[in-house]
Amino acid sequence: MIDKKQKPVKEEIVGIIFLAFTLISFLSLYTDSTGIIGKHIGIFLKGFFGTGSYVISALLLVFALMFLFTNKNFIKLHRSMALLGLFLMFISLNQLYYFPVLTDFKDYLSVAYISGINNTGGGIIGSLIVYFLVKMVGIIGSYILLISFTAIFIVLITDISLVSLIKSSYDKLKDRKKVSAKNKLQDKMAEKKAEEVESTEELVEVEKKERIDVPIEIVEQVEEERKVYEKAFLEKEEGEYTPPPITLLKEAIPSPKIKNEVLLEKAKKIEETLRNFGIEAKVVQVTKGPAITRFELQPSAGVKVSRIVSLTDDLALSLAAPSVRIEAPIPGKSAIGIEVPNEKITPVYLREVIDSKKFRSFKSELAIGLGKDIAGNIVIADLAKMPHLLIAGATGSGKSVCINSLIVSLLYKASPKQVKMILIDPKVVELNIYNGIPHLLTPVVTDPKKAAGVLNWAVQEMIRRYSLFADHGVRDIESYNEKYKEERLYKIVIIIDELSDLMMVSPAEVEEYIFRLAQMARAAGIHLVIATQRPSVDVITGVIKANIPSRISFAVSSQIDSRTILDMTGAEKLLGKGDMLFDPIGASKPIRVQGAFISEEEVEAVVNFLKENYSSHYEEIKVEEKTNGKNLDEEEDELLEDAVSVILETGQASISLLQRKLRIGYARAARIIDQLEQKGIISGYDGAKPRQIILPREEIQKILERKSV
């Protein structure tokens, strides 16, 4: 008797506890005032059930109330199971609608969990059902099965036959036809108004759904890294060299978020366009970058890659894009990359790169912050490993900004005792702003005639260092600095902003010095960065190109220019404004990078900080012998007369001719040609055209006789 009396009390206690739990669960979805437990319950429900978390919490609340206030079995078992099935169909359809394209299983579950927390999709439970359904029967088959089972569960819950419902609706429609014309018109008007209201409500719901942002966790991580890096700067204040404050550089602007629906629509357009040309392929992954979005495409068996590559223009037309670049295949993947420009380019600021953990932890003092790749990862290059860099790009493509980013990266990474720079700027206006910083070895060289002398000094410094290494029994600058820490040698970075201007003034000397430095200077700690806006073969000669394997190409005007700099096409498809192809030494294919941007105001702020806090100490570099070509008469070559005899006999003058006939090296033959030009015997350098003999034979003989006297 006592047990029977206590049974209702126990059930009531269980019911109250159940009601309290469901009430907390229900409120945790709408408010943050439920504490730590409520917060975790809400995250769990959203992560596992997505938008269905609101439905299941409401159902549990109703069940708790019915369990507490009714003494009978309030719902039959088959209806309970049907209700559960209907709920699973709801979250599965929701998941399938928002995320139909499958990725890696773990990535798909991870995205579903994060999206569920942000009230999108069907959470982990919905993603599990959808993943296996799509794998088995595809997207269309999944929709058919889910809708069919939804109808079955509705029938089980309501006990209403769908067939009888359709028949009764048809009978009512027949009866309605018998009504008078006046009533028909009124009914039609009423239906139209109702449809307008319904369509308006549907539009509002769609807009609300589209406004839901997909969470990007990278933003929070970047902010944390910035705080850490600012602390790192503060810790260095007591040392000999303090890099400029990071606050001198502009902060990054939050990137505009592209809706998943837009990306899925573009993926479908790509598949449809290829299908129209008889190519079956499927987009398996979409990667959004700062400037472009890459669609990874897997063609069906038997489809040639060249067929897809040939449809570049057709894909651009279908997607209404200014240009489309195809990477076939993507290195390390069995997929083809279709790179489509974003409607809005997200600028990558240099602060975002320098302020990153990757740049801060980079061990080399010659670290260069280039920008971000397609996946949004920060790209850092090591100039010490390149060991030289060739940069080319048309006007306005971002070449000068890249050079500024490179220089400022070195200023933040290395002290003047570690790295010194020689800046050669024939254009005068680009690099002059850096005069006075402590990292400069000599003031910015703006005279093209003096530039050859500076390069000659670099060659002599390289030879001196190799002699020093030989005397001390070491192989390179790293070994020397490690062994003799008190006599450390600084590394030298030579930056030439416009190579074509130097090649026009003294091509033979400049080519020879660059050739020698590119071949031998790496171990001596001397590195070249050469930039040009005219990547033609008379500027980037075969000798220079063969000895500088690392290259960066910005947007160029033609495929020929792209082949000249990269040995392949593709640079003509770039967007400009910092869009580059980075081809480091050892890479199988170039990496597409959105270059880091730094404004003139930021450069000026960094330079002013260094000028105010540090004094510049220039080394004396003697360049008199190379600044005036007329001094060549003072060191006339012994074989000059023999060279004159050769050109008079053959009727032509060239370096290669003197090399063959006189059996001398390139440098000596080039020097003799320069001396003949200064004496007015032969014409000057004119690109690919051969030099002409200007003076008649008699005048030449008089000059030589005068010299012998």
Curated annotation (Swiss-Prot):
Membrane as UniProt keyword: yes
Cellular component annotations (GO), alphabetically ordered: plasma membrane
The organism's place on the tree of life at top rank: Bacteria
Segments on the Cytoplasmic face: 158-709
Gene Ontology molecular function terms on file: ATP binding; ATP hydrolysis activity; DNA binding
Regions crossing the membrane: 13-33, 48-68, 82-102, 114-134, 137-157
One Pfam family of this chain: FtsK_SpoIIIE
Membrane topology recorded in Swiss-Prot or TrEMBL: Multi-pass membrane protein
Gene3D superfamilies to which the protein is assigned, alphabetical: 3.30.980.40, P-loop containing nucleotide triphosphate hydrolases, Winged helix-like DNA-binding domain superfamily/Winged helix DNA-binding domain
UniProt record, GO biological process: cell division; chromosome segregation
Binding site for ATP: 396-401
Main location: membrane
Annotated CDD domains: TrwB_TraG_TraD_VirD4
Record-stated family: Belongs to the FtsK/SpoIIIE/SftA family.
Subunit structure: Homohexamer. Forms a ring that surrounds DNA.
Function: Essential cell division protein that coordinates cell division and chromosome segregation. The N-terminus is involved in assembly of the cell-division machinery. The C-terminus functions as a DNA motor that moves dsDNA in an ATP-dependent manner towards the dif recombination site, which is located within the replication terminus region. Required for activation of the Xer recombinase, allowing activation of chromosome unlinking by recombination.
Domain notes: Consists of an N-terminal domain, which is sufficient for the localization to the septal ring and is required for cell division, followed by a linker domain, and a C-terminal domain, which forms the translocation motor involved in chromosome segregation. The C-terminal domain can be further subdivided into alpha, beta and gamma subdomains. The alpha and beta subdomains form the DNA pump, and the gamma subdomain is a regulatory subdomain.
Protein name: DNA translocase FtsK
The organism of origin for this protein: Caldanaerobacter subterraneus subsp. tengcongensis (strain DSM 15242 / JCM 11007 / NBRC 100824 / MB4) (Thermoanaerobacter tengcongensis)
Gene that produces this protein: ftsK
